[in-house]
Amino acid sequence: MAEPLSDELAGAVAIVTGAAGGVGRATVELLTARGARVVAEDLNPAVGELENAQVVALRGDVAEPDTARRAVSLAHERFDALDVVVNNAGRFLLKPTIETTDGDWDELLRVNVRGAFLHCREALPALSEHGDGRIVNVASISGTIGLPGQTAYCSTKGAIVQLTRQLAIEHAPRVRVNAVAPGAIDTGFMDEALAGVPDREATLTSVAAAHPLGRLARAEEIAEVIAFLASPRSSIITGAVLMADGGFTAQ
């Protein structure tokens, strides 16, 4: 008989970056619904809205070493453990290569790659200590294929894919490291991507139609994949990149 999911993460302690909205917020809500306690981290002050008995909020810049150190310390101070890290924070850029500025390039690398690396580095000693640590990196289909206007973004997400594989090999068997690669998601990220696009609704319809399932993913659906990779149900999986893209990359 299948075990219920309601308490599959009971006792687990997680750090979730980019937690104030979208996939990050949905992940915090799902992990806590399944029994986990969470350090919810974001630069956006809205992260404070998530505070409750199971969640402690941390405001900070994901790409600053002190933020990563504080997140790990807070997990131990408030919940006396650290089992899971979800590297979700990220920035998007839709701009042709020749129009991409030095500042654009540096900022995407800083947030998308440096931020994830710092949180992995600072958390790995604690994750490895108890022998069942889990890291879930939020990559993208853009890290596995080329897409027009996404040179900087594709490069950073490709780095996340390779970081995932490298850490999985380096830290097995005590820490499992996996990634989820979403396609287009109906969140603020999509709003950011379409900023300045004249006919937003027509563009959204076109983007949805490009996915075989015919729609954008919901934040809650990506959170389900993250929760799976953070749970004992995925105990044989490490170094994997799970495509959660409505079939986009199967074409």
Give each language-model segment a name:
Residues I98, I145-T151, G214, P232:
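Active-site loop immediately N-terminal to the catalytic Tyr-X3-Lys motif
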Residues P125, A168-P173, S235:
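Alpha-helical segment proximal to the catalytic Tyr-Lys
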Residues C120, T156, T164:
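Active-site helix of classical SDR
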Residues F79, F117-C120, D132, R215-A244, ...:
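C-terminal substrate-recognition "lid" of short-chain dehydrogenase/reductases
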Residues P96-T97, T101-L109, I135, V207:
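Substrate-binding pocket helix/loop in short-chain dehydrogenase/reductase
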Residues V13, A20-G21:
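Conserved glycine-rich cofactor-binding loop
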Residues S140:
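Residue(s) in the substrate-gating loop at a strand-loop-helix junction
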